[in-house]
């Protein structure tokens, strides 16, 4: 009976994948069984950079009682990134409906468990966030997921669709001189679509051998430009000995196939294989993961390979943790690397306002990071406080940088072009997390960056001219983050969230232009009417700052959102 169910499941997946598309998050299981506690959410604040779904493992939440996993530390805080709604899978409630509206923005969130049996669950979810006006931005998502639990494994299938709509509203901004031109409505706009489907299985038995397998399809669609098809396959297996020693292998295959709507465009289909053999040692106070990523890309590039259109490069995947003083002092270090395939999705994820034609023909595969390492220690001076201090170094071959193009001496930003540059980056930073009796939560973070300088190549690859840079471009020199949540009583809760980013420069018409610091101050509050109904109010960017996100593109000003959250 179990084999029969598996065969039916596979046939259903193939028929769907041939006509639709999918999300490619490995081992991702979404559920709508959630605990909707009165928490403050940043539902209305749209991100200023596209937030496409990628193949990555979500970081675990900080747990003060165990405190055994290093905090995930990004190389910079993402400016004005929207906070996502968080859920805890505990409550038997079947769904949630959340909506809000402001003077220039709207928000909608829906999740419902259509069917639930002892071993099977079917979930439906959707969301929509929009900001209106000449700097319009709309992001929508609709998805479905099916999970079935067998005796010794779980099987899942999900399908999802995304849409991003935005306008090209860029204007020149020069320090305190204000906006120069183009005060009317922009005439250019763009829709980006993504559809995806995944099917996978994961072992759940208590034996020494564990495995998982997933195959997925994803289509990224830029109308009138191209359709980027990706087939993603993942397999891993590991064997545990004596509960301390683990040996295994991870295998990932990525195939990218293009359909272009412009016959004069030259696009190379690309294929990537990654194999990571690894060894893990687990002890009460020590954890070690030692692996080597062996990457082979076919389509373009050379790197360590002498064969045309084939790129080969190894990189480390090492993680080390040492609980030195019974969860009071923790030392950790890691060193990772990768080689990636350039994609139109990744290209527009860097900056949605880039020239799409250039991205379609962006065949360079040199997205190679030989090493991205950091070392740090965590201190817990009291039970409810965690301090994390760290330093890091990264070296990127083919890091992306932009140039803003000004045509006919016009101060209006006509377009951006992307070029590649090898980049080194050093950083030091710290994070602090504190909570008091589930009443006060404090999260603070700050980073400082240093970039050893090189020579910046001309946009014209045939030109012998070089620009000697005095700084790196599109990167912050420092950033900071502060958030405080206060649960006043069982009904009321308030929060304050603040982000700061500074020391950024833009490359404009082969010259250097300083960007304004990003200062984003946000507050909000929520009132729980009863177990099922909450009302919330948010005020974002209440200083009404027009922060420079990119040269010529500024963030949204002050806006509010009044919303209702209903659980059923």
Where are these regions (language model features)?
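Exposed, low-structure sequence patches enriched in small/polar residues
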Residues: 97-98, 287, 291-568
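N-terminal periplasmic/intermembrane-space "pro-region" immediately following the signal or transit peptide
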Residues: 19-87
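Short sequence motifs at beta-strands and strand-loop junctions characteristic
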Residues: 89, 102-104, 134-138, 185-193, ...
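Bacterial Sec-dependent N-terminal signal peptides
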Residues: 1-24, 329, 484, 558, ...
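Flexible loop and strand-edge segments within Gram-negative outer membrane beta-barrel domains
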Residues: 131-143, 156-210, 214-230
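Outer-membrane beta-barrel translocator/receptor signature
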Residues: 77-81, 87-142, 153
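Surface-exposed extracellular loop regions of Gram-negative outer-membrane beta-barrel proteins
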Residues: 111-131, 250-253, 268-302, 438-439, ...
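Outer-membrane beta-barrel transmembrane domain signature of Gram-negative proteins
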Residues: 189-200, 214-287
